[in-house]
């Protein structure tokens, strides 16, 4: 009775702020799974805290409460003899909060879909494409892989509001990851760059540009014989300076987060994941606490 590695979707704030996306935490992203397996994931995250705002916008003391539900599908693939995966995630969120705008208190409520996210990943070293029967004898050592995620510029968005659920821009996130197993322990490291398109209809009709956000993430995972696994995570990110109508903002981000994940098998097809994270050191950008849960159902030939 095991929970397949790397198949539970990442759950992050479905807001337009770039740093919330860059702070996403996902242990076991680079691991092996039998070819042809399908995964359906439904999840919920509650997050509360500050939000990313441009230095040129007089918004201070911001605090948001965000309830996010996520539906995702993933499938493991054979990519030229190496294991891979494709997944798609669609978030829906409800947010409410308050802040001070030009010294006056303001409030905001919104709900709607966030932009869908598509990702393809491939393991280059240490994770060959295997059938369910072959996978029974597989033992992980060192895995090296990469992924490419794309976010679509759709979802709820109102240019007359500073805070929205959709982002009204594309993003592309290439990532490189390494995973080393020794006994029940696995150490994982990954580095990524989140590259943003321009929002040509930002608040007040302005054009908003944002520099890439670079991140470094580490996980220490312990796997129990029962199929339960637990992970501690630390992530650091920097970059993301914004430009509004050609004017550079003084909002370089340089922050870190810590988190924990617990994955529990229910039976051969069903599993549950519990998750929590918090800001550790925040210079500029999104500072929030989050807790969540996800349910996964898997099916495929040989299961």
Predicted regions and their residues:
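Surface-exposed strand-loop-strand hairpins of Gram-negative outer-membrane beta-barrel proteins
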Residues: 47-68, 105-106, 159-166
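Repeated loop/turn-to-beta-strand initiation elements of outer-membrane beta-barrel proteins
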Residues: 50-51, 81-84, 128, 184-187, ...
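Residues on the lipid-exposed face of transmembrane beta-strands in outer-membrane beta-barrel proteins
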Residues: 42-44, 71-75, 118-124, 148, ...
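Outer membrane beta-barrel transmembrane domains
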Residues: 25, 203-303
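Outer-membrane pore/translocation modules
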Residues: 94-209, 250-251
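Transmembrane beta-barrel strands of outer-membrane/channel proteins
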Residues: 40-46, 86-94, 144-152, 189-195, ...
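Residues that define the transmembrane beta-barrel architecture of outer-membrane proteins
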Residues: 36, 63-71, 111-118, 142, ...
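Outer-membrane beta-barrel biogenesis signature
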Residues: 21-41, 126-140, 300-303
């Amino acid at each position: 009775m095991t929970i397949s590695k790397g198949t539970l979707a990442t759950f992050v704030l479905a807001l337009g702020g770039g740093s919330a996306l860059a702070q996403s935490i996902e242990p076991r992203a680079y691991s092996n799974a039998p070819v042809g397996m399908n995964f359906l994931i439904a999840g919920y995250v509650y997050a509360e805290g500050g939000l990313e705002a441009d230095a040129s916008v007089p918004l201070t003391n911001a605090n948001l409460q965000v309830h996010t539900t996520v539906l995702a599908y993933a499938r493991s693939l054979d990519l030229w003899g190496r294991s891979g995966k494709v997944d798609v995630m669609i978030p829906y969120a409800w947010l409410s909060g308050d802040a001070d705008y030009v010294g006056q208190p303001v409030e905001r409520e919104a709900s709607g879909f966030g932009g869908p996210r598509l990702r393809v990943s491939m393991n280059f070293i240490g994770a060959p494409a295997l059938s369910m029967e072959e996978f029974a004898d597989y033992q992980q050592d060192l895995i090296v892989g990469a992924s490419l995620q794309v976010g679509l510029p759709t979802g709820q968005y109102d240019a007359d509001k500073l805070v929205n659920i959709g982002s009204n821009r594309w993003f592309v996130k290439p990532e490189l990851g390494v995973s080393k197993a020794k006994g029940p322990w696995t150490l994982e490291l990954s580095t990524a760059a989140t590259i943003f398109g321009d929002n040509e209809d930002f608040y007040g009709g302005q054009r908003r540009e944002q520099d890439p956000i670079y991140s470094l993430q580490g996980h220490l995972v312990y796997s129990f014989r029962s199929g339960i696994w637990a992970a501690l995570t630390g992530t650091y990110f920097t970059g993301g300076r914004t430009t509004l109508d050609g004017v550079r903002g003084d909002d370089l981000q340089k922050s870190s987060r810590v988190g924990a994940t617990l994955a529990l098998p229910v039976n051969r097809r069903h599993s549950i994941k519990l998750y929590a994270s918090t800001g550790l050191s925040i210079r500029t950008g999104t500072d929030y606490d989050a807790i969540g849960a996800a349910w996964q159902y898997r099916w495929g030939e040989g299961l």
